[in-house]
């Protein structure tokens, strides 16, 4: 409800254009109201003129420690972060929106990726919150935000658009052209791997 009942973008989506997203929290340790957890995020968008979906994000974040009391409402204010749990959820909402909009227009998701970065900037001031610090891990939220914005990501984001919009979305109308475009787009991943061997774009497909 926290995600579904909030408007995250000014864009209007038709029913068949909506992003299918699931976030699953895996609790590893529990001490009263303190949770040591992981969160699995999966998101898919429809492929144009088909019954298929394509994966936008399939990522396991292994650093989610938070405090939560049963029945406590989740709340988010863009100017203030009060919970590591809500901050993490909001961060991935913006990452998903960024990847979705990138798949429809070249770097079309920049605004949302920048909003995800803003969450990182704010969360870093909370010393007890895990998953936000630079150099703690090459697969945490800081790493995801950085990977989507550094110079090496340009090739990835261009590939992302070409693969989805000019490739998959063309398959119904012209399968040969769509397939050729997809094959031609994939070498860009090697560019990212060469420039940033430990990038989360390689490890976690963020």
What are these regions (language model features)?
Residues 86-95, 99-103, 175, 179-183, ...:
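Solvent-exposed alpha-helical segments and adjacent loops
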Residues 115, 119, 179, 200:
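Phosphate/adenylate-binding glycine loop and adjacent helical scaffold
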Residues 31-146:
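Acidic/His-rich structured neighborhood in mature extracellular/periplasmic domains
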Residues 122-194:
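Alpha-helical segments in soluble extracytoplasmic regions
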């Amino acid at each position: 409800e926290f995600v579904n009942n909030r408007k995250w973008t000014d864009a209007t989506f038709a029913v068949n254009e909506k992003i299918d997203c699931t976030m699953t929290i895996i609790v590893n340790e529990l001490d009263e109201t303190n949770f040591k957890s992981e969160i699995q995020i999966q998101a898919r968008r429809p492929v144009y003129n088909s019954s298929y979906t394509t994966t936008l994000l399939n990522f396991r974040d292994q650093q989610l420690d938070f405090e939560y009391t049963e029945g406590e409402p989740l709340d988010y204010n863009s100017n203030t972060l009060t919970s590591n749990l809500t901050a993490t959820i909001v961060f991935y909402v913006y990452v998903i929106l960024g990847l979705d909009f990138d798949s429809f227009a070249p770097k079309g998701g920049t605004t949302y990726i920048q909003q995800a970065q803003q969450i990182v900037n704010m969360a870093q001031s909370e010393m007890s919150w895990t998953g936000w610090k630079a150099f703690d891990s090459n697969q945490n939220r800081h790493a995801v935000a950085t990977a989507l914005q550094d110079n090496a990501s340009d090739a990835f984001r261009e590939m992302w658009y070409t693969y989805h919009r000019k490739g998959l979305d063309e398959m119904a109308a012209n399968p040969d052209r769509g397939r050729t475009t997809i094959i031609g787009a994939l070498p860009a991943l090697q560019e990212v791997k060469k420039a940033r061997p430990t990038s989360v774009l390689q490890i976690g497909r963020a």
